Amino acid sequence: MEVLVNLMPHELVLEIEGRRYIVDHVEGAAVRVSYDLEEIFKIGNKIPVYREVPDSAVVKGLPDPEPGRYFVTSAMVARAAQRPDVFSPNTHPKYVKRTRRTGPIESVCGLISYI
């Protein structure tokens, strides 16, 4: 059996072929990513602009892989994890449902892999 585990701090609402699926978040789950930054320049000699140092990301709190178990996290965590079992919600404007054109996202129609 395949299981989708929501590690985000809120529920995930998927709308697939006209049906809604609500995936509750795991209580107490705290998956985080940290990375090093380096200043690349200043705007107007005052406002610093940083970039993420390549390959410096460290993911904490992500469970180890298990066959048939898939994890949904934030895009930042999924991108840093670089694992085939870790995804983020597909929030591309073409693939979300909203009550208003610029309103909050009600549901997504799929997930995104970053590998």
Task: Tell me what each language-model feature is.
Residues 1-3, 7-115:
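Intrinsically disordered, low-complexity segments enriched in small/polar residues
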